[in-house]
From Swiss-Prot:
Recorded family membership: Belongs to the OPA3 family.
Protein name per its UniProtKB record: Putative OPA3-like protein CG43998
Keyword Iron-sulfur: no
Source organism superkingdom: Eukaryota
Length: 153
């Protein structure tokens, strides 16, 4: 396992397992006491994972693919399914937090860009006013020069 050589990776994986453990235990308890949840929510992902895992291992070993892969026993499938669902739950929370942070950053950036655009608009209006004043002053200067030329003649 490549991530096993990195201490930060080990800490991260250990943290995820520690966080997802109580939720997994709850799912296992629900699987034991509620057959509907066990049969339709917990066991199918575990059986699907088992099928993909066995087929991929056989494919990597270049062995013949069996027509039917034997299903996992109920306790093993319950444990595996509960672990998978608990880690998916933690992953979902993490993805939700990332989405929240990204949307918050996007909103903040959008607000800053809007403020910059407003400042640009105000500055453009000021420049237009100054340009109008300069043109008016230039016309007055030209009028005064013309008046001085007429007076000198």
């Amino acid at each position: 396992m490549v991530i096993g050589s990195f201490p930060v990776g080990k800490i991260f994986i250990h943290g995820v397992k520690r966080i997802s453990k109580p939720f997994g235990d709850l799912l296992i308890w629900m699987g034991k006491h509620h057959p509907f949840i066990r049969r339709y929510i917990i066991i199918p992902p575990a059986q699907l994972y088992n099928t993909f895992e066995v087929r991929s291992k056989l494919r990597m070993l270049r062995l013949k693919q069996p027509r039917r892969i034997p299903p996992l026993s109920t306790p093993v499938a319950t444990r595996l399914g509960a672990d998978m669902l608990s880690e998916a739950f933690v992953f979902g929370i993490g993805a939700g937090l990332i989405y929240y942070e990204l949307s918050k950053t996007y909103t903040k950036t959008k607000k800053q860009n809007q403020e910059i655009e407003d400042q640009k608009r105000v500055l453009d209006e000021c420049v237009d006013c100054i340009s109008a004043d300069v043109e008016r002053n230039q016309r007055e200067i030209n009028w005064i020069k013309a008046a001085l030329k007429n007076v000198e003649k």
